[in-house]
Amino acid sequence: MIALGIEGTAHTLGIGIVTEKSVLANVFDTLTTEKGGIHPKEAAEHHARLLKPLLRKALETAGVTMEDVDLIAFSQGPGLGPALRVVATAARALAIKYNKPIVGVNHCIAHVEITKMFGVKDPVGLYVSGGNTQVLALEGGRYRVFGETLDIGIGNAIDTFARELGIGFPGGPKIEKLALKGEKYIELPYAVKGMDLSFSGVLTEAVRKYRTGKYRIEDLAYSFQETAFAALVEVTERAVAHTGKEEVVLVGGVAANNRLREMLKIMAEDRGIKFFVPPYDLCRDNGAMIAYTGLRMYRGGVRFKIEDTVVKQKFRTDEVEVVWD
């Protein structure tokens, strides 16, 4: 069975084509701005402009035609309304034109589900990106959120800090590079609130300290990372302890950070459990994860009518009954 997936929840438009066992194509185009941030209307215009050429590229890369595709999947939410609507409209049009079944996929669930292509069975997932920070796992037939950010996503916090330091966007790789040269830990507010996280306090204090001119930016970058990532690992470890799961996966754009990977790996080794990070092109927002999750859903008996494909900007993971595992 071949599934085509369209991702477009935020600034990345991605189209993926997969089978149960392999990725045939996974192409994307990301809207970038010098100052960072995403305007929903601009994201929608970007997606609308690039959908046809990107679809053509995906089909060529996979070596298939639309007639060969068995299923259309799309990111139904959560995300930016205008961007989601462009993707949903395109998915509906393809499904109707080529008489294919259609499935709407929860973007956050897809980030975790794609790891199952690599043999992961039942993990606790730490999903970290610009707008999202969640610890989630399957419990009682649904993906439960065991902890999440109460304010801003870790990726947005890092990018905002980088902007304040004047080192540009995207900030993640630049902060990581600076942090490697850090020699001294500077105390910052800890980001754990029960099982949830808050990054506004650590961000505000790091910026305040930077503006005093008394601290090296390398030390501030190092301290920011250590403080924020320690909180992420702590909440993930608590979820592991609560659920008794024996696998941890790291997904989302911030999964590119080597220090975060290292800290999670140490935690997993200490607990005697497995740790896995997918290849980066399957960590970031991408169409292949949407296609793969849609395929698993369809195989498990999930069916959508066209009227079921309305986008959901605030689509919670626990709204989805997982009947396909």
Swiss-Prot record:
GO cellular component, one term: cytoplasm
Cofactor: Fe(2+)
Binding residues for substrate: Y127, V128, S129, G130, G131, D159, G172, E176, N257
Catalytic reaction equation(s): L-threonylcarbamoyladenylate + adenosine(37) in tRNA = N(6)-L-threonylcarbamoyladenosine(37) in tRNA + AMP + H(+)
Binding residue positions for Fe cation: H107, H111, Y127, D285
Record CDD domains: ASKHA_NBD_Kae1_arch_bac
EC id: 2.3.1.234
UniProt-annotated location(s): Cytoplasm
Enzyme class: transferase
GO MF, any single term: iron ion binding
Disulfide bonds: none
InterPro entries for this protein: ATPase_NBD, Gcp-like_dom, KAE1/TsaD, Kae1_archaea_euk, Peptidase_M22_CS
SUPFAM superfamilies: Actin-like ATPase domain (SSF53067)
Keyword field: Acyltransferase, Cytoplasm, Iron, Metal-binding, Transferase, tRNA processing
BP term (GO), one: tRNA threonylcarbamoyladenosine modification
PANTHER family: TRNA N6-ADENOSINE THREONYLCARBAMOYLTRANSFERASE
Function: Required for the formation of a threonylcarbamoyl group on adenosine at position 37 (t(6)A37) in tRNAs that read codons beginning with adenine. Is a component of the KEOPS complex that is probably involved in the transfer of the threonylcarbamoyl moiety of threonylcarbamoyl-AMP (TC-AMP) to the N6 group of A37. Kae1 likely plays a direct catalytic role in this reaction, but requires other protein(s) of the complex to fulfill this activity.
SUBUNIT field: Monomer. Component of the KEOPS complex that consists of Kae1, Bud32, Cgi121 and Pcc1; the whole complex dimerizes.
Protein name: tRNA N6-adenosine threonylcarbamoyltransferase
Source organism of the structure: Thermococcus kodakarensis (strain ATCC BAA-918 / JCM 12380 / KOD1) (Pyrococcus kodakaraensis (strain KOD1))
